[in-house]
UniProtKB/Swiss-Prot annotation:
Protein family according to the UniProt entry: Belongs to the class-I aminoacyl-tRNA synthetase family.
Region: Disordered, residue numbers: 683-712
Organism: Saccharomyces cerevisiae (strain ATCC 204508 / S288c) (Baker's yeast)
Taxonomic classification: Eukaryota, Fungi, Dikarya, Ascomycota, Saccharomycotina
Biased composition (Basic and acidic residues): 683-706
Taxonomy, superkingdom: Eukaryota
Motif 'HIGH' region per UniProt: ranges: 65-75
Pfam families (UniProt xref): tRNA-synt_1e
PANTHER family: CYSTEINE--TRNA LIGASE, CYTOPLASMIC, CYSTEINYL-TRNA SYNTHETASE
Name the record gives this protein: Cysteine--tRNA ligase
Cofactor: binding comment: Binds 1 zinc ion per subunit.
Chain positions of motif 'KMSKS' region: 427-431
Post-translational modification: The N-terminus is blocked.
Record keyword Protein biosynthesis present: yes
Length: 767
C-alpha cells in the first residue's frame, strides 16, 4: 500500500507543470538621481564630487591657524563653515573623512611678534615699569620713525607731534583709507602713543606703556632684534595661541581634526621634500643658503601649470611679497624671477634656525602645508580647504611645489575656498587690527547664533556680518525653539490621552506630502554645493506648515507625523553642527545662552524632583508598614532640615498655616546650617546628660537593692564589733562584753528600722 501511494505521488509531481514566479519589473526612477556637486576653485564651477578611492573614503587637508594672536570672527567663519561642510559630507552623505589640519608655528609673523613682545617686556622692566622721561624720549624717537615710514607725507619729514596733528587734520582721510587699508590702524597707533607722551604722568604706567607698544616695537626690533638667540622665545608664543585657538574651536563646537600636524615637528621632512624638488629640477639654492621654487621652469613644463587657483594673479608682486613674509629680503636675494618663492629661508640673526644641506635656515611658509598634507594623505588628495585670501599665492604655491615633488599633474582634486567675512561691510584682518576676537563675539552672541549666521550664507560667498543677518538668525532660532517646545508638549499630552484614532485625514496626508517634499529639497540643497542657506529655509518653511496643521487640526491632530518632522529637523540641524537633545526633539540647550530654552530645565529641576521622589518613596514605605505617626513627622523634619536646606530652600513652620517657603543665598544657608548644628549639639549634650543621670540613678538603685538584700536582724552580726544581740538582732554588748550605751542603742535601732524598711520594700516582710 505504501509503495502504491509513493508511486502515485511521484506520478502527480512529474505530471504537474513547473510553478514559476511572475516576472518582476525593475522600478523606473521618477527623476534622475541628484549627485553631490562642489564648487571647485580649480574649475571655478560646481563639479560632481568623485572620491579617488572609488568608495566611501575621502582624504581632506585644511589649512589651520598661524598661531601668533587671538582668533577673530574671520577665522570663525572659515573654520565653522569648513566644519559644516565636513559634517554634511561625512554625516549626511556617509563618506569616511580623514581630516588633516595643520598648526603653523614657524612663520615670519610669529618670529616678529615673539621677538618684539620679548624686547618690549624687557624695555618695560629696564625702566622699572615707570613711564619716565627716558621712556618718553625713546618713544618719541620711535614715534616719528613710525609716522614717516607708514604715512606718505608731502614735503619734509614729520618731526613734532604738532606737525603730525596739523597734517592729519588737513588730510583727505577717506581717500587715504581707500588707498591703504592699514591707514586707520596706523593713525590709532600714533594717537595712542601721543596720548601717553603728553599725559603719561597722570596715566597708569601699565596703560601708558601699552598705548606706545605699537610704535615702539619696530624701533626696538631694529636695534636689538638680531641679538635674540634663545629658541624658547619663539616656542612660547605659538604654544600659547595654539591652545587658545583650540579653546575657541571647542566653544564653537568645531570637530577636532582626525590628525593635527605642527610645522615645528616636520622640519626634517620639509628638508627632504625640498631636496626632492631640487632633484626634480624645479628648485635652486642661492648663495645665502636659501632655496627658491623655479616658477618659470615649472610653468613651461608640458606636464605642469602654475597658479591653478587664480592664474590672473600670476606676477602680482604685492601678493607674492606678502606671501614671502615680512622678514624676507626682497633686494639682491638671488632669485631668478620675482615670481619665485622661498621653499627654505636662510636664517638671519635673531631668527630660529635648523641645520640643512644649504646651511642654517627655516622652512618657507608655503612648503609647510605641502609636506604635512602629503605625509599623512599621500601624493593625491581629494579635498583641500581654506580661506579665499589664501588662494594666491599660498595655495597656488602649495599645488606647484607638491606637483613638482611628486611630478604629477594634480595633487588636489577639489579646492574649497570659504568666502571673506566683513563686519558691516568692512573686511576683518589681524594685520589691520580691526578684528573682533571669537571670545569677544561669544560675549554678545551664542555659539549657536554664530553657526546659524555662517550657515545662512553660502560657504564660498562673502558674508557680511551685520544687524539684519543677526535679526534673521534670531528669528529662525526663536521659531525653532517654539516649534520644538510645542511638539514636546503635544507628545506629553498624547501620552496621557488614551485611545485615539490613528487614521490619517486629508490634513495629515497633506502634511506628510509637505514633509516628503521638504526632505527632497534639503537633499537637493546639500547636493548643490552643500547649500545650507536653502536647507535652513526649507526647514523653516516645514515648521510653518507644521504649525498651520497644529492650528487647523486642533484636538484631532495626530502626533506621529509631527514627531517624525521634529526628529528630521533635529537630525538635519545636528548634521550641520547643532547638538541635539537625547530625545531628538530639538537642539540641546546652551549653557549661559539666552535662547528661549531656559537653559537645561532638566539640570535645574532634577535635584528638587529627586528630593520629592525620595520623600514620596519614604512616606510610601512607612505607610505600607503602618508606621507610627511620629515616624512620618521625622520624615517631614528631615526634608525641612536637611534635604531642602541643602538645595537653598528654607521652610518656616507656622501655626494653622502652610509653611513659609524661603529661597536662601549660600551665606544664609550656611548660617541656618550652623544654627541647626548648634541646636543639634545642644540636644545631644542634653541627651548625654540625661543618660548620665539615668545611669547614676540606676547605679544608686543597684546599690540600694544590693543593700536591701541584708535582713535587719543580720546587719549587726559583726563579731569584731559586737558579742551579744537580742532577738531582733540588735547588739546588746560590744566586743569586750560591755553593755551598749542607751544613746548607741538608740542610734543602732534607728539604722535597724531603716534597713527593715528597705528590706521589706524589695523582699517583703519576713514571715
Amino acid at each position: 500500500m505504501n509503495i502504491f501511494i509513493k508511486a502515485l505521488r511521484r506520478y502527480t509531481i512529474m505530471s504537474t507543470p513547473k510553478i514559476v514566479q511572475p516576472k518582476w519589473k525593475v522600478p523606473t526612477p521618477q527623476a534622475k538621481e541628484t549627485v553631490l556637486k562642489l564648487y571647485n576653485s580649480l574649475t571655478r564651477s560646481k563639479v560632481e564630487f568623485i572620491p579617488q578611492s572609488g568608495n566611501r573614503g575621502v582624504t581632506w587637508y585644511s589649512c589651520g591657524p598661524t598661531v601668533y594672536d587671538a582668533s577673530h570672527m574671520g577665522h570663525a567663519r572659515n573654520y565653522v563653515s569648513i566644519d559644516i561642510n565636513r559634517r554634511i559630507i561625512q554625516d549626511y552623505f556617509g563618506y569616511d573623512v580623514q581630516f588633516v589640519q595643520n598648526v603653523t608655528d614657524i612663520d615670519d609673523k610669529i618670529i616678529l611678534r615673539a621677538r618684539q613682545n620679548y624686547l618690549f617686556d624687557n624695555f618695560v622692566k629696564e625702566n622699572d615699569t615707570k613711564f619716565n622721561a627716558t621712556v618718553v624720549d625713546k618713544v618719541k624717537t620711535a614715534l616719528f620713525q613710525y609716522i614717516n615710514k607708514n604715512f606718505t607725507i608731502q614735503g619734509s619729514e614729520i618731526k613734532t607731534i604738532e606737525e603730525f596733528e596739523t597734517w592729519l587734520s588737513n588730510a583727505d582721510t577717506e581717500t587715504l583709507k581707500l588707498e591703504n587699508p592699514k591707514f586707520p590702524m596706523h593713525v590709532t597707533a600714533v594717537q595712542n602713543a601721543i596720548e601717553s607722551i603728553t599725559k603719561g604722568d597722570s596715566m597708569d604706567a601699565e596703560v601708558a606703556f601699552e598705548k606706545v607698544k605699537d610704535v615702539t616695537v619696530p624701533l626696538l626690533d631694529k636695534e636689538l632684534g638680531s641679538t635674540i638667540s634663545n629658541p624658547e622665545i619663539f616656542r612660547q608664543l605659538p604654544a600659547y595661541w595654539e591652545q587658545k585657538f583650540n579653546d575657541d574651536m571647542l566653544s564653537l563646537n568645531v570637530l577636532p581634526p582626525t590628525v593635527t600636524t605642527r610645522v615645528s615637528e616636520y622640519v626634517p621632512e620639509i628638508i627632504d621634500f625640498v631636496q626632492k624638488i631640487i632633484d626634480n629640477g624645479y628648485a635652486y639654492a642661492t648663495s645665502d643658503g636659501s632655496v627658491y621654487f623655479d616658477t618659470l621652469k615649472f610653468d613651461k613644463s608640458p606636464n605642469h601649470d602654475y597658479a591653478k587657483c587664480q592664474p590672473w594673479n600670476k606676477g602680482q608682486l604685492d601678493l607674492i611679497n606678502d606671501g614671502e613674509g615680512s622678514l624676507s629680503n626682497f633686494a639682491d636675494n638671488g632669485k631668478k624671477s620675482n615670481n619665485d618663492f622661498a621653499l627654505w629661508k636662510a636664517s638671519k640673526a635673531g631668527e630660529p634656525e635648523w641645520e640643512s644641506p644649504w646651511g642654517k635656515g627655516r622652512p618657507g611658509w608655503h612648503i609647510e602645508c605641502s609636506v604635512m598634507a602629503s605625509d599623512i594623505l599621500g601624493s593625491n588628495i581629494d579635498i583641500h580647504s581654506g580661506g579665499i585670501d589664501l588662494a594666491f599665492p599660498h595655495h597656488d604655491n602649495e599645488l606647484a611645489q607638491s606637483e613638482a615633488r611628486f611630478d604629477n599633474q594634480q595633487w588636489i582634486n577639489y579646492f574649497l575656498h570659504t568666502g571673506h567675512l566683513h563686519i558691516e561691510g568692512q573686511k576683518m584682518s589681524k594685520s589691520l587690527k580691526n578684528f573682533i576676537t571669537i571670545q569677544e563675539a561669544l560675549k554678545k552672541f551664542s555659539p549657536r547664533q554664530l553657526r546659524l549666521a555662517f550657515a545662512s550664507v553660502q560657504w564660498n560667498n562673502q558674508l557680511d556680518f551685520k544687524e539684519s543677518l543677526i535679526h534673521e538668525v534670531k528669528s529662525f532660532e526663536n521659531s525653532m525653539n517654539n516649534f520644538f517646545k510645542t511638539i514636546r508638549a503635544l507628545k506629553n499630552d498624547a501620552a496621557s490621552a488614551g485611545h485615539i484614532s490613528k487614521k490619517f485625514s486629508p490634513l495629515e496626508k497633506e502634511l506628510l506630502a509637505d514633509f516628503v517634499e521638504s526632505e527632497s529639497k534639503v537633499h537637493s540643497a546639500f547636493c548643490d554645493n552643500l547649500s545650507t542657506p536653502v536647507a535652513l529655509k526649507t526647514l523653516s518653511e516645514l515648521v510653518t506648515k507644521s504649525n498651520t496643521y497644529i492650528t487647523t487640526a486642533g484636538a484631532a491632530l495626530k502626533i506621529e507625523p509631527l514627531i517624525a518632522i521634529c526628529s528630521y529637523i533635529t537630525k538635519i540641524l545636528r548634521i550641520i553642527g547643532f547638538p541635539s537633545r537625547p530625545d531628538n526633539l530639538g537642539w540641546a540647550a546652551q549653557a549661559g545662552s539666552n535662547d528661549g530654552s531656559l537653559g537645561s530645565l532638566e539640570d535645574t529641576v532634577m535635584p528638587y524632583v529627586k528630593c520629592l521622589s525620595t520623600f514620596r518613596d519614604d512616606v510610601r514605605s512607612l505607610a505600607i508598614k503602618k508606621a507610627e505617626p511620629k515616624e512620618f513627622l521625622q520624615l517631614t523634619d528631615k526634608i525641612r532640615n536637611e534635604d531642602l536646606l541643602n538645595l537653598n530652600v528654607a521652610l518656616d513652620d507656622r501655626n494653622g498655616q502652610s509653611a513659609l517657603i524661603k529661597f536662601l543665598t549660600n551665606d544664609e544657608k550656611l548660617e541656618i546650617v550652623k544654627l541647626n548644628e548648634e541646636k543639634h549639639a545642644n540636644e545631644l549634650a542634653k541627651k548625654q546628660k540625661k543618660l548620665e543621670q539615668q545611669k547614676l540613678r540606676e547605679q544608686k538603685e543597684n546599690e540600694r537593692k544590693q543593700k536591701a538584700q541584708i535582713k535587719p536582724q543580720d546587719m549587726f552580726k559583726d563579731v569584731t564589733l559586737y558579742s551579744a544581740w537580742d532577738e531582733q538582732g540588735l547588739p546588746t554588748k560590744d566586743k569586750d562584753g560591755n553593755d551598749i550605751t542607751k544613746s548607741m542603742t538608740k542610734k543602732l535601732k534607728k539604722q535597724w528600722e531603716q534597713q527593715k524598711k528597705l528590706h521589706e520594700e524589695y523582699f517583703g516582710e519576713d514571715k
